[in-house]
């Protein structure tokens, strides 16, 4: 699930990304409320203009990521963000934690994030993530 375009606010981006997952049958309202509750408790800004909103607890039957790339950064709490990964990890699946390995590489690698921003398409995002997978495993 992928969005490229402008966004008025943090809450709007979260809602759009959640709605994409909802329309695919991957999310329900309980997940959305858990994500928003988590946002109210702590920031999901991770540095390098990247935010990773996620629920307080694992609620999904399937792991998924919804991605937004924003041509103009938006304020995310006290920082600016132009890439958002809404992440939900499958409950009761210890292998699903591998997803955080990919994301931690992205967070710490500014070059990779710049590659994604340079060509903000789903195809390029898939290519970059595939390369991360090859490099890590």
Q: What are the residue ranges of the model-derived segments?
A:
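Cytosolic covalent-transfer regions centered on His/Cys nucleophiles
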Residues: 1-137
